[in-house]
Amino acid sequence: MISPTMEQGESLRIRVVMGKDRISELPDGLLLKILSSLPTNIVVATSVLSKQWRSLWKLVPNLEFDSDDYESEHYTFSEIVCKSFLSHKAPVLESFRLKFVNFNPVDIGLWVGIAFSRHLRELVLDFYPAELGKGVTFTFPSSLCTCNTLETLKLVLCILVDIPSPVLMKSLRTLHLEFVRYKDESSVRNLLSGCPGLEELRLYRGDDSDIKVFTIEVPSLQRLTIHDNNDGPEFWGYVINAPFLKYLLIEELRCPEFCLNAPELVEANIAEVTSITIEKFLGSFTSVSRLLLNLSPLKITYPTGSMFYQLVSLEMYTREAEWWNLLTLMLENSPKLQVLKLTDRSQNFHKDGLVSGKWNEPKDVPECLLSQLETFVWRRFDWGREEEKEIATYILKNGRRLKKATFSTNPIESEELNKLKERRKVLNGLDGVVRASNSCQLVFKFDPSYLGSDSP
């Protein structure tokens, strides 16, 4: 029985014999770029095509191995990886990606060591044991944090970060930690403090109780992503000190505390924050110029006296109960706001009771409506709700600088005549509003994403 790689190569060779081999006429540099985008088992398979291809694959600067792709009666996965490294001749290894089900720590340490000796720039380790959830982990030790050329490190799933003492990866710019575990809080601090040039950090955490406080203190950090659904009682929250942070994305956060020092923050996208009640949470973002909020005002306390003096673009989701109360507060405290976008991400236009309460317009017209707001977009506008019609009317009546207002709604089947008539009546009503801005262009359209994607 021949290996899958040999079978793939034979198939390629047959196709080349039957037709003209035009690919081989391309320059070697271009061929290497093409091969670099393919998994290593496919790249190795091209070696049967000709003498040119036999030597060409050995110079591909990327090695990618997935143990699921290598099932052979002749060689183990470990032997295949070792043979590939022995044959590989590229002087600089741009990327080494390893996805494995079972492992021998000695083998992995050897492969990573060889990759480091070839000036490795990206390392991806993805361990998904056959018995996921049984506590089996691969320990990522401090001895692997020694590569001076490494620019990107990605650790995925059942990997235990165990770094008892400080390390140094002076060239590391990007670090992804996706559902890994941590020996203790010291391991987190030692890893992050050993990356003096780190610019991007992505954290994905599940329901674990490895640490009580996740501390991120990285002066060079510019981009931070957090997705954390850990709501265990042992986990307190985050302490982040990133004086040069420019971009923050929080996809999910269930911990009770969040302390952020990021005075240079420019853009923040905040969603699915469910347990934080501290008033200063929103106050951490007063320096931003662009802000996206998908929050429930019933779960987040607005910071008294906080002003968003730099905010020029605000996007809010409209599916949470009494979301308009948060909108009112943001309008009142964002005097330079120029762009306002409202989106119903749920695609459920009548929200089935998720939205409740009644909107009350501000006592005084917010400064941004009087002098700054130029663009107003409402995606998946729920024309059937009185509160949303009132909010839309209020903004049109008071937006003195408004240049364009766009409302998109869900498609309605042609046989639903009553709905078609009602929607036309509502949209005609908006069109008839006496707008504060004579130059405001009003646009109505259907939202095509309603039919397929749930993305905003």
UniProtKB/Swiss-Prot annotation:
PROSITE patterns: FBOX. InterPro entries: F-box-like_dom_sf, F-box_AtFBL13-like, F-box_dom, FBD, FBL13/AtMIF1-like, LRR_dom_sf, LRR_FXL15/At3g58940/PEG3-like. Pfam families: F-box (PF00646), FBD (PF08387), LRR_At5g56370 (PF24758). LRR repeats lie at residues 74-100, 102-127, 152-179, 180-205, 225-252, 270-295, 318-344. It comes from Arabidopsis thaliana (Mouse-ear cress). The keyword Protein biosynthesis does not apply. PANTHER family: EMB|CAB62440.1-RELATED, F-BOX/RNI SUPERFAMILY PROTEIN-RELATED. Keywords: Leucine-rich repeat, Repeat. It comes from the Eukaryota. Residues 20-73 form the F-box domain. Residues 358-409 form the FBD domain. Transmembrane segments: none annotated. This is F-box/FBD/LRR-repeat protein At3g52680. SUPFAM superfamilies: F-box domain, RNI-like. The keyword Repeat applies.
